Every structure is written in structure tokens, then in C-alpha cells.
């Protein structure tokens, strides 16, 4: 595989002396100040893209040197990504901005197998990384003529309200006996290697949130992009790519009645999505970001197992924290409900309680970044029972020939498979080529690295359409029964 470009940033670390400081993410009472210095590995005179496909940062945390590897999140935007706002006279204004050369990255810490990172490099470095089991945040200090950044732990952010923040979901979709029985099965590690799924996401911002950010559409847009980048990172272990399809800002007034009763707001938003938003642009799921204070301690709500249903593939999320990472965890949680996941509680004689997992009923401190085994079981059960069709197909994207980057969710020039993790049994992470003896790495007609037999049903009949069956020569599931 062609050697990717590496950029090294040297960070000098200075301990802060004094009390707290007010950052964009809130008041922080303990942090380190770092000054990035960029050193490029490109030959002198070479043309640099604004944002490289791959970067490497070296810095110290608590006196220990770390190496942060970053790769651009090329699956962040759909090819038809749009942004919509409204003029003072109520006219809908939609644009299709160029987002190919964006500045949002995912990554990991060298020699830390459990590490993750989600970083924006748009204006300095902003985001989070997980190091040795602890979550750190980084953001620019916004000092005049300075490259200073702050690195700090989530627990060092001063909390205005210590009361637990709750998800408003209470229903259980596992109703009939066959589903109950299936829900008690535990997945093997092999079964937890989920096939790739894709969710084209629409984000709608209500008028209260527009006012909250001083009517600054650009600030809201950046916040939404950072949020989806974080959500995308948290869904990687489930092999789900969250792609932002559209962003709509209700910049004049709300198009539904947003009210403190979260259940009513959710129902109204679902009906609006079904009758209005789906007619504007294709997408799989819509999330309403609002600044309203819901009744009780509710900060989010979504229909369980609603994915791909016109009025139920929705969620409502309160933008209650200045820290975008926290709100991203809430959105990840509500999307989990749409994908069939219930709260991590003791249920059906299963021990599912996990206070530090994404699907816990209350947001943890620090916010969770991992799904429990029970959540993975719920998701697999949802796929089996509902067979949601809308998340099978990869979103349209611009086909560019670029340096192959493993694990970016898409096949690129020179890749036979998107390898991602070195533990992938079918795909060599070093070369992005199939391992010896492997015919495939993923797909509806791929099973344990081999093509499924000819005429194996890979997609059940829908309406007048017949069953789709494997050809025996490809990992893809052909449409309309064309199996040869």
C-alpha cells in the first residue's frame, strides 16, 4: 500500500497555574497548555492540500509522550449533502456546499489498542481522544497571536447541574414470545462482526437553538459537523457508518410545535419528517436538536426499533451542554434506540445493567463511548426481526482516486477490502488485500471469508419483488433476483 503522508506536530507542554478558565466547552479547573508546531514530511516545494488525508501528532500527556494517528473521516458527508435555512419572508434556501476537503478526523493512540480519537482540525485542534482508559479533550485557547491549546479530562469541567440527565424512552419492543426467546441468545465474537451498514442522517436545528447561538448559522453548522463526526466514531465497533445527508436550521420559526412534553414533540417531529422532510431529500434517519427544557430530567427520546420507518426513524436531543462531545453521546444513545437497542438494565433474566455504557438510562460521568454486549445483542436481534432495508446501501460519494487509507469505511483505489482492525480474519490490515484463501471480507453473500453458495437467499421478498439470491461468485447481494 502506498505510504500515506504523515505530518508531525510537536507540542511543548506547560502546566497551568491558577484557578479555572472559561473554554468553549465550559469552565475547566485543571488542564495543560500545549503549543503545536507543525513539521511537514513533504519534500520542499511540494503542494500541500489544506487538510491531509492522514496526519500524526506527537505530544505529552501528564509528562508521558503519546503519538496520535489521525485519518480523515471520508464517510462523514454524503455526495448530495445539503444545508437549508429560511429567509425572513419564509422562503426555503438550500445550498450544496463542497465538503470533499473537510477537516474532520478519526484516529488512535500508538501502542494503545483500546484508544480512540475524534478531532476537528478546522481551526486548531478540537475534539477528544481516549488514552489508557481515560477521556481527554483538546481545544484552542483562542488567545491573541497564540497557538495555545488546552488538554484536560472531562471530569475537570465544572458542572452547572449535577442532577442525573435521563433518556425518556420507557417502551420495550420485544413483545411476542419468539422475539423474547431470541433476545436471550448471546452473540459469539464471530457473530458480533456485524456486516457494514450505513445511516444517512438528517439533523434539524430548532429556532430556540438558533437563538441560543446568537443566530450564527456557521457556528451551528460547525457544531453539527463535530457532533456527527463523534457519533460516527462511536458506531465504528458495530460497523455502522453515520453519514450526514442534510442539515436544516429553522432560522425564522419552528416548523412544528416544540414543547416540554418530549413524547409529543417526538410524535410531531416524526409526522413532519414523514410528510415534509422525506419529500425534500432522501435520508434514513432524522434527529431534532433543540434547546427546549423537556419535562423531568429528559434530554433525549426516540422510538425503539424505528429505523427506516417514515414517522419513527427519528429522535429528539436536547443541546443541554456546551461540550459538543456530551451532546454527541446523547445522539448516539437515541440512534441506538432507533436501531433496536434498549436501556442497559436487568431484563428478561439477563444481566444488562451497565452504568458506564452508551445505552445506560442516565448519561454517565464521564460520558460513555462503548456499547454493552446487551446492546449488541439488541441490535443483532433488530436486524434479524426487522431486516431494515434503508441502511443496506452505501451513500453516494465522490469517487476520487486517493492514497488508500485502511479502515475508512470505503474501498478506494488499490484496496480489495476495507481492513480497519488488524484482527479482521478476512482482510490484511497492512495491505488492504484479502488474506490467503479469503474470497471476501464483508457483504450479504459473504460468510466467514467465503462466498455463499449460489441461490442462497440474501434478501427476502418485498411486495412484488422476488427473493434476492447470491450468485456464488460475489459477496454482493444482487437486486431483483438476478442470481444467474
Curated annotation (Swiss-Prot):
Disulfide bonds listed in the record: 308-390, 352-374, 354-357, 417-432, 419-427, 426-449, 440-446, 445-470, 458-477
Tissues expressing the protein: Expressed by the venom gland.
Primary localization class, coarse: secreted
Cellular component, GO, one term: plasma membrane
Motif Cell attachment site location, chain numbering: 462-464
Domain of life: Eukaryota
Sample GO molecular function, one term: toxin activity
Protein name: Zinc metalloproteinase/disintegrin PMMP-2
Lineage of origin: Eukaryota, Metazoa, Chordata, Craniata, Vertebrata
